[in-house]
Structures are given as structure tokens and as C-alpha cells.
Amino acid sequence: MNVYRTHLCNELREEHIDQTVTLSGWVYRKRDHGKIIFVDLRDHYGITQLVFNDSDTTIFQLITTLRLESVITIKGIVKARDSSTINETLDTGSIEVIVSSINIETASEILPINIASMQDYSEDIRLTYRFLDLRRDKVKNNIILRSKVITEIRKSMENMGFIEIQTPILTSSSPEGARDYLVPSRIHHGKFYALPQAPQLFKQLLMVSGFDKYFQIAPCFRDEDARADRSPGEFYQLDIEMSFVTQEDIFNIIEPVMINIFSKFSNKTINKEFPKISYHDAMLYYGSDKPDLRNPLVIQDVTEIFRDSEFKIFNSNIKQGMVVRAIPAPNTAHNPRSFFDSKIEFAKTLGAQGLGYITFIDDSLAKGPIAKFLDKDRLDNIKLICNIKAGDSVFFVSEIADKAALFAGEVRTLLGKELNLIEENTFKFCWVIDFPYFKYDHKEKSINFFHNPFSMPQGGLEALENQDPLNILAYQYDIVCNGIEISSGAIRNHKLNIMYKAFSIAGYTKEMVDEKFKALTRAFKFGAPPHGGIAPGIDRIVMLLADVPNIREVICFPLNQSGEDLLMGSPSEIDNDHLKLLSLNIIKKT
């Protein structure tokens, strides 16, 4: 028999009345009623109310002085609660345990975090004492949710015939967009392993090895700055790769997995069909490659309406190659001037010169700084294109296309929030497809890959040889939910001649490609199947399901905003003997 407990703290019911039981757990709450002290005993599973009375002075004195969160084992008799004290919010709310003996397993010191309180604490306190923070229901439930989500994902993948395979953690550096975490080799002096940013090359090699459907709950490591939806250092993804598939095959596999997870673990509605939006349209209509479709506002291009107009600022910008984007603001025409001024100031904080705007007071009256420069036909066209009705306003931004998209997107987001337009209690998924294959690096004055260098260009070798590189699209795709990118994927480039050509456009010689990716190029010489994959982020999925604003809320032991583990004290200095063993020397920054 277990000496610590006969039952868990969520188990006891009326059918256990008059039984002698043993329970163990943490002292969650104490209520001193003079001659009686009530204690809520908590374990992982729930809470049971204990009753201590002063008839046994030794036990009573112990519990009187014992601090909250001390760990105890008790024996006692289960009794029914008085009807007036039944707690229907607890599974055990109809009973209590009259304590006859107690053993203090470990006594707690004064708590830096009140476990039973909803009080907010600083992130430094929470992460330094994460073992206490994890005792709080909200944080604990997030971690339990994460476990359940991963279990359900594994079931889904196995049911579809996928094989779970672990890939190496110590590998070589790869050019996947972020900085690597490097591990010095003790044996091979001057050489380093890299922690994988993703299992990209390994999962492709698995396809070349003849495996048909691979998945892994994969740890990934990227030396990136923190954001609300990105934890520095380490994250996990559902890594997937399949042979003999097209882009549509990937969509058909992963959509049901996402729908199942979000339906099973949330009461929010979910769109059962994921619309497909090209990267071009996402940037044009939403000002972001991560469009939040809960926001009904749609940006429109009104460059041609302002071309050759009397509004000289925009007309001059257009002649210099700039564009004009319009962001509708419903039911704001009668808002005070301060409303419009605040949006102009907001745009300036982003780096824009400002915003123009027109208020459509009624069907025949338009006001604002720009309205007087536009004739009726131009105003009517704005109303038509932007779906404007009487009482609405429109904001305008004029910049080069990339900046115009950014500024318009931020204004769209701000208006959606301020005007309470964001649809609540729903998950709005979409695919973003047709990403550019290359981009121009203005700083380096060179062409580089836009995203994944291992993806297949649309049009294959012919496109690489005959098209402007900046016009070539890739078989790359993202899943976006509520404005958060939760997955990226691609159909891979499995043909060496296409790979060499693509890398040559980005400035790599054949010899450089063979040296950098020797395993992949060697493998592709022995029969590589067409293959593709995707990798939804576990942390972001759980963050959305838990409805928390920060990804660190769903990670058990996260790094802080500065990439520090305050609990374990890392990163930390290494002693000189260890450095010498690794042939390393620390150069102090001046």
C-alpha cells in the first residue's frame, strides 16, 4: 500500500464517508476559526478540505504555525459537510476530512509568490521561482493543455500512417535565416556543432532514404530576439515531411489536423475551409503576410484614382513610383478631430510622413484635408472601391509599395481594435501561398532567397533561366491563424540542376553548395523523390488555444525577454579549465 496516499485530492465523495484515508499534498489555503482550522490540501489532481480541531493540541499547534505550500501527509476520517458549507465548485465539495494525524514532509519558507492569488507578479519573479509559478492553476493548466495537444497530434499523425523519427540535436550550421547556437567540439579543436534551427536537411534525407511519411515533435534552436509570439532560444514544432506530394496534398493532410486540435481543445468557432491568399494579395489587402481575418477591414490600392489629380503630394509621389493605399474606417465620419490626429501621429511613429483622410458625411458631402482636391468622379470611385457608405471615413498612405503595405497594415490593425471590429471567440485560418522565391538585398546590393532556399521554384529550371529572379514565385506556404503565423512549409527542390541554378542566382557557386550541403547534394545523386513538408509551431498553437498574449505562458521553463534562464542562471560563465579543454579563449568586449 502507498504510505503517502490512499486517495488523490480530487477523489473523495459521499460514498467514502466514515472511511479512514491518507492524503498527501501542499497546504493551499488555511482558514483559522479559533478552535477549528480548515485547510485546503492540494495535489496535482484537485483539492480536499481538511479539518483540524483543538482537541489534539499537538496537531493543532503544528498546523497553526505551518506555512502555506508546506507538504504534508495526513490521516483522517471522511465526513459529510454541513449542507450550508457544500462547495459545488470542488469535485470533493460535499465532504471533508477530520484529521487524526499529520506528518510534515517539508516545510515551506515565506513565499515570494502567493499560489492561491490571482495577483500579477513581474516576469523576473515568476521565472526565478518558476517551480512556484507552475503551481498556480492558470499556468499549470496551460502546461497540461500543451501535453494533451501533443498527445492528440501524435494520435492524428499515427492514424494517417506517419512514422515518428528523432533527428540529431548536434549537427552542422545551416543558412535558415537566424543565428545558430554553436557547441564547441572537445575532440575536434576549433570546430563547432550547431543546434538545429529545424530538422530541414535531415527530414529531406529521410525522404531520400525511402521513408514515405515522417513526423516529429521537434525541438528547434534559433538565436533570435524575443517577441510576444516567439520565445528566444528554443521552440517546438510538429515537423512533417512526405514523399510524392504536391502542395495541395500537404494542405489536405494538415488542415484536418488543425481543425481537430482547435475544435477539441477550444469552444471557439473555426472556419472549416482555409482560404488561400497569395503573398501579393496578403500584402495588398491586409498589409501583412500574416493577415488577421477576424478584422473585416480591407486595404485597397487607389493609386490610379490619385494619378493626375489636383492633390499634388500624392500625384508627385505616384510619378516617383510610389503607391496610394486606402484603409476604410466605418462609422467614424462624425468622430472628433482628435480621432484622426491620433492616427496621423501613430503613422508617424512607424516612420510614415503621415496619413491623409476623407470623411464621407453623407451621400453628397465629403470633408477632410484631401476631399477638396478631388472631383466627384474620383470621390465616387473611392467610395466604390473601398465599399464606403455615408458616415464612413477613409485613411490614405502614400509610400513605396513595401512601406505603404506596412503602414497601411498597422493602421488597419489599430482601427480594427479601436473600433471594436475584431470578431471574438473565433479562429480564422488561412493559407498564404505564392511567396517570392528571391528578394533584393538593398544593403548588400545582391539577390538572396526570400525564405527557404530548399524550396522548388514555380516554373522550375525554365523560370530560373528565363525570368527576372524577382518575379519568380516559390512553392512555399504558411498557415496563419488570427494574425499569427503558426506554420511554414514548402515543396522541396529535389533536382540538383535546379538547386545549383537557384543558388547561383543567390551568389553561391556549385562548389560552395556542395561544401555547405554535402549530405543533401550527395544524396540527391542517388534518386531523390519529389517531396514536401510543413512544420506547425506547437508553442503558438497552444498559445492560441490557451488564449494568452505571450508564448512564455505555455512553455514550462522559458527564457526571459533577454534570453536568460533566471531559474537555472544561464547563460553562465565557464571556468578556465573547461575553456582550455575546448581550446577557447574569452575576448572581453570593450
Swiss-Prot record:
InterPro entries: Aa-tRNA-synt_II, aa-tRNA-synth_II, aa-tRNA-synth_II/BPL/LPL, Asp-tRNA-ligase_1, Asp-tRNA-ligase_1_N, Asp/Asn-tRNA-synth_IIb, AspRS_core, GAD-like_sf. It catalyses: tRNA(Asx) + L-aspartate + ATP = L-aspartyl-tRNA(Asx) + AMP + diphosphate. GO terms for biological process: aspartyl-tRNA aminoacylation. Its main location: cytoplasm. Keywords: Aminoacyl-tRNA synthetase, ATP-binding, Cytoplasm, Ligase, Nucleotide-binding, Protein biosynthesis. The keyword Ribonucleoprotein does not apply. ATP binds at residues 222-224, 485, 537-540. Residues 200-203 are annotated as: Aspartate. SUPFAM superfamilies: Class II aaRS and biotin synthetases (SSF55681), GAD domain-like (SSF55261), Nucleic acid-binding proteins (SSF50249). GO terms for cellular component: cytoplasm. Pfam families: GAD, tRNA-synt_2, tRNA_anti-codon. The record marks 33 as: Important for tRNA non-discrimination. Transmembrane segments: none annotated. It is an enzyme of class 6 (ligase). It is found in: Cytoplasm. L-aspartate binds at residues 176, 222, 451, 492. PANTHER family: ASPARTATE--TRNA LIGASE, MITOCHONDRIAL, ASPARTYL/LYSYL-TRNA SYNTHETASE. Homodimer. HAMAP family: Asp_tRNA_synth_type1. Belongs to the class-II aminoacyl-tRNA synthetase family. Type 1 subfamily. This is Aspartate--tRNA(Asp/Asn) ligase. The lineage of its organism: Bacteria, Pseudomonadati, Pseudomonadota, Alphaproteobacteria, Rickettsiales. The gene is aspS.
